[in-house]
Swiss-Prot record:
The gene is ACT2. It comes from Plasmodium falciparum (isolate NF54). The lineage of its organism: Eukaryota, Sar, Alveolata, Apicomplexa, Aconoidasida. InterPro entries: Actin (IPR004000), Actin/actin-like_CS (IPR020902), Actin_CS (IPR004001), ATPase_NBD (IPR043129). It is found in: Cytoplasm; Cytoplasm, Cytoskeleton. This is Actin-2. Its EC number is 3.6.4.-. SMART domains: ACTIN. ATP binds at residues 14-16, 18, 157-159, 213, 303. ATP hydrolysis occurs in the polymeric state. Unlike for mammalian actin, ATP hydrolysis also occurs in the monomeric form and the release of inorganic phosphate (Pi) is more efficient.
Amino acid sequence: MSEEAVALVVDNGSGMVKSGLAGDDAPKCVFPSIVGRPKMPNIMIGMEQKECYVGDEAQNKRGILTLKYPIEHGIVTNWDDMEKIWHHTFYNELRVSPEEHPVLLTEAPLNPKTNREKMTQIMFETFDVPAMYVSIQAILSLYASGRTTGIVLDSGDGVSHTVPIYEGYVLPHAINRIDMAGRDLTYHMMKWFTERGHTFTTTAEREIVRDIKEKLCYIAMDYDEELKRSEEHSDEIEEIYELPDGNLITVGSERFRCPEALFNPTLIGRECPGLHITAYQSIMKCDIDIRKELYNNIVLSGGTTMYNNIGERLTKEMTNLAPSSMKIKVIAPPERKYSVWIGGSILSSLSTFQQMWITKEEYEDSGPSIVHRKCF
């Protein structure tokens, strides 16, 4: 591996793949982590037809494809499809040969150990990379915000987790993870629309609902008040969304009922604590001396934290939980959708990080289990 080789940073989210070159300030390409396969055989003989499509191409042809996400709740469930996504990332999107660049991958905390071993194996054996590293997503988000102490609340498409970090040290005993995130909200929104007579059932229609959710949903400062307002003055809350076939759909109280599940998961029938309680429990598992600094540095990251009012609502909920004299500060950086990737870009271009890479020689000596020794 030459000194000049720029590292590739690939943030494999459950919903989106963010990838680019180390040292850049934003990911070069962002595409959905989807693999689509045609539902029907092709009869137009002259037309070139692939057996599968990846990313944006799958998204554009979604009407004739069955779409599958290879990553569910942050864990890779289909390795063949995952390889296709990585292949697409390196050769079609970034247009680089992976055998010439070290690769930094990201992972959710508390993932099964076999998941990162298999990632390591595929990188070295299939893509022949000279070196690689696997980093925890939340730690990278903290790097991106320019802090060394804080509690990161990362919520993406598949996993939400809270990770307290003090002076650069992760406190693994205090990490909390809930397998409820953006995708669960999308599924629930589909159910609500079905109750109102709009059927969204296919995998392609699920993507339409995801778009409605991203464009129209917001978080209510006071859920009960907002419900009352939506019943009395529904016109203030309703928004019109145009479906791809030209039909119009009115989205009313779903706009705030859907993301409310982040704070009250029982709304969608989940038995896990809300985001604010998860963060509070994480802080309470930490040493009493550092709690004050953690309350003061609650950093949001991930696409599911992009809803309007989320920072204010989280501040309000945390203030109710914390001791009354405690100052609560929630930091919601505008680029938080990509902060994991940005942190990876910063980390992999540091000169001090260069000895951290798992090299090909080390992999050949020790096998995939080296990833547990070299990466946190």
